[in-house]
């Protein structure tokens, strides 16, 4: 591993400049797409990319372009096709950030095994700690409110986030049959498309809203490292708060894996520490200036997440979900973050639900250890990998039940704005959770 960058050495003025720096390589590809003859068709074709081995079919794009723009100048269409083809080729074929050293590859695998063998805890920590802390940061969340997508379709972003994390934390995420590389490239491009659309004011937004330059640029470098740290630091601290015992080596492996993912997402090296303890300091530096009481975004974003958790968790009511929020967070944050900023009254939390969760979690760990103890030594090395794959499949099934679209992995559609979401909702109207469960496990069943 190389010597870690240390953004803590930057002055406040230098650090703040990163709120005005974006991601030029991804922005170039987004600009080419948005200036294409019919970019909605390009979105659909790019949306078909899932596996790392998938390729963009430019023949399909060319055919669609002439169909939708038959009255256009053929030379102009040809120029735009070639320009966009080069831009997208340059973007998707540039995999330098995924040329990992043997040491980095092993670290990514160890982090994936850790995530998947603790998937229940990691997923809950992601939901009730990582995302809620994201929503408490005022400037970073303005883009979520401005685009309207999260307020109108809150579950889509929550589930898409979970899908992304599962794609990049799969044990085979960065192998040809995996989904991690494409998921990262698509998310990076989604950010760039949103930035470009805000810059030219073509994005569906809250009527009358204007982007305030004091917020910085949309999805800027500081926002990006902040978000990456909520997926690494906050997940780890959530597990520790809930009572999990995690070694220093596991903590550093998990953090370093997300350092590599952050780099691939376009975070600049000088803002992307490779050491956990430096990352912790950087994240708290951002929290101190972004966590403010007068944050109208926080409650508007936090409440749909709580409702989502009530819907997907078995036998959970509001008090039970608030109990999980308490379990996975630190007592010092209960009032200043959850009460004052997000308007979540954790005093209403139920201890019964968290007690039941802890009991079943402890029992699961005991059973895992017993089974491992009685395994032949020759099979022990693959035991946790198999366990991770099984838990990964289980959570994928939960996500598939909860969502209202058919894509199996991280999608690019939400970069299009609310029109795509509305179109998608019409194709698959939301059913109650129990009906979706029936349809998932029994596809031929008639459920009205």
Model feature map: region roles:
Residues 1-448:
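Mature, function-bearing regions of proteins
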């Amino acid at each position: 591993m190389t010597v870690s960058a240390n953004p803590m050495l930057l002055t406040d003025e230098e650090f703040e400049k990163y709120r005005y720096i974006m991601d030029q390589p991804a922005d170039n590809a987004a600009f080419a797409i948005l200036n294409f003859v019919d970019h909605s068709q390009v979105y659909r074709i790019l949306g078909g990319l899932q596996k790392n081995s998938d390729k963009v079919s430019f023949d399909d794009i060319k055919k669609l372009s002439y169909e939708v723009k038959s009255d256009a100048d053929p030379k102009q269409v040809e120029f735009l096709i070639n320009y966009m083809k080069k831009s997208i080729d340059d973007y998707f074929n540039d995999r330098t950030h995924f040329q990992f050293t043997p040491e980095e590859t092993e670290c990514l695998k160890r982090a994936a095994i850790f995530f998947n063998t603790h998937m229940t805890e990691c997923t809950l920590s992601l939901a009730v700690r990582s995302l809620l802390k994201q929503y408490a940061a005022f400037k970073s969340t303005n883009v979520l409110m401005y685009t309207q997508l999260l307020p109108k379709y809150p579950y889509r972003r929550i589930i898409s986030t979970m899908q992304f994390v599962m794609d990049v934390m799969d044990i085979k995420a960065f192998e040809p049959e995996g989904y991690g590389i494409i998921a990262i490239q698509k998310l990076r491009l989604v950010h760039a498309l949103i930035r470009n659309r805000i810059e030219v004011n073509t994005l569906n937004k809250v009527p009358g809203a204007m982007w305030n330059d004091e917020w910085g640029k949309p999805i800027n470098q500081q926002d990006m490292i902040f978000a990456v740290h909520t997926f690494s630091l906050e997940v780890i601290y959530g597990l520790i708060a809930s009572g999990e015992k995690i070694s220093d080596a596991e903590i550093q492996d998990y953090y370093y894996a997300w350092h590599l993912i952050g780099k691939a997402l376009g975070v600049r090296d000088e803002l992307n520490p490779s050491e956990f303890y430096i990352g912790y300091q950087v994240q708290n530096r951002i929290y101190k200036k972004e966590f403010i009481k007068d944050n109208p975004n926080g409650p508007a974003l936090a409440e749909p997440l709580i409702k989502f958790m009530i819907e997907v968790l078995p036998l959970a009511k509001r008090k039970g979900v608030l109990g999980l929020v308490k379990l996975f967070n630190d007592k010092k944050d209960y009032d200043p973050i959850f009460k004052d900023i997000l308007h979540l009254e954790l005093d209403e939390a139920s201890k019964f639900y968290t007690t039941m969760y802890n009991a079943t979690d402890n029992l699961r760990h005991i059973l895992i250890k017993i089974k491992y103890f009685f395994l032949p030594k020759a099979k022990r090395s693959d035991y946790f990998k198999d366990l991770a794959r099984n838990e990964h499949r289980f959570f994928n099934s939960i996500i598939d039940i909860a969502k209202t679209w058919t894509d199996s992995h991280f999608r690019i559609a939400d970069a299009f704005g609310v029109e795509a979401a509305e179109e998608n909702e019409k194709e698959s109207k939301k059913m109650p959770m129990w009906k979706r469960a029936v349809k998932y496990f029994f596809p031929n069943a008639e459920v009205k």
